[in-house]
Amino acid sequence: MARTVFCRKLQKEADGLDFQLYPGELGKRIFDNISKEAWGEWQKKQTMLINEHKLNMMEPNARAFLEEKMSAYLFDDVEPTIEGYVPPEK
């Protein structure tokens, strides 16, 4: 049976992540409060951010930048700015 969480991003009950995907306290917070659906949405945004900013994920500054954007997106409902991207109409 799938684990469910009240997703803070989507503001609804949804299937939770199968395991902690990110290390540390932030990872625990994500595991406890973010759904698979919201995590999948973040992964798409993350890919766009990495490409747009030409981030090298071996660099600590790039990882810190992405972590800041991830936390803001998942918990503070702050949409990352991706130049030239127009979200689809709902």
Swiss-Prot record:
SUPFAM superfamilies: YggX-like (SSF111148)
GO MF annotation terms: iron ion binding
Keyword NAD set for record: no
Keyword Hydrolase: no
Gene Ontology cellular-component terms listed: cytosol
BP term (GO), one: cellular response to oxidative stress
Alphabetical UniProt keywords: Iron
Signal peptide feature range: none
Matches recorded under HAMAP family: Fe_traffic_YggX (MF_00686)
Similarity comment: Belongs to the Fe(2+)-trafficking protein family.
Role this protein plays: Could be a mediator in iron transactions between iron acquisition and iron-requiring processes, such as synthesis and/or repair of Fe-S clusters in biosynthetic enzymes.
Entry protein name: Probable Fe(2+)-trafficking protein
